[in-house]
Design a protein with these regions (language model features):
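Acidic catalytic/metal-coordinating carboxylates
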Residues: 40-41, 67-75
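Conserved acidic carboxylate
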Residues: 16
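Non-catalytic signal-transmission and effector/linker regions of two-component phosphorelay proteins
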Residues: 1-11, 86-91, 125-139
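Alpha4 helix (beta4-alpha4-beta5 surface) of REC/receiver domains from two-component response regulators
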Residues: 70, 90, 100-121, 126-131
């Protein structure tokens, strides 16, 4: 795929302790024209997070030191505080990457705030992954 003009200026943060897979995604998305930040330590991501810098945040669902949902809640709180302090209304999206088989029914019961589209499987081919990310940043 050649870089799409609508990916220019789209900033994505990937937070995942799976260095190999997250590096692969970073490469794929940069080839597609996205601006990427990759952080493999969720604590570093939390400490340095500024919601005004990103259009999409992809978080590893199961990381060894922090659960993806715990990190989501921390980033969401940071976002709310930044919006209050700066009167900003940056609209970014947080979604999850998982290598586990996804049980959407169980996830939607536990976390109704996320639709099925907010779960990205790590097992999909490059073209499917890229298409999914395009839909997340454009929708």
């Amino acid at each position: 795929m050649s870089p799409s003009s609508n990916t220019n200026n789209k900033n994505i943060l990937i937070v995942d302790d799976d260095v190999h897979t997250s590096s692969k995604y970073k490469k794929w998305l940069e080839e597609e024209g996205f601006n990427l930040t990759l952080i493999n330590d969720p604590y570093v991501a939390e400490q340095n997070f500024n919601p005004e810098n990103y259009d999409l945040v992809l978080i590893g669902f199961r990381m060894s030191i922090v659960d993806g949902f715990d990190l989501y809640h921390k980033l969401h709180e940071i976002s709310k505080k930044v919006q209050q302090d700066t009167s900003s209304s940056n609209d970014f999206r947080i979604c999850f990457m998982t290598s586990s088989r996804i049980n959407y029914n169980a996830l939607s019961e536990a976390h109704p705030e996320f639709g099925e589209e907010c779960y990205v499987s790590k097992e999909v081919p490059k073209d499917v992954f890229i298409k999914h990310v395009h839909s997340l940043v454009s929708g």
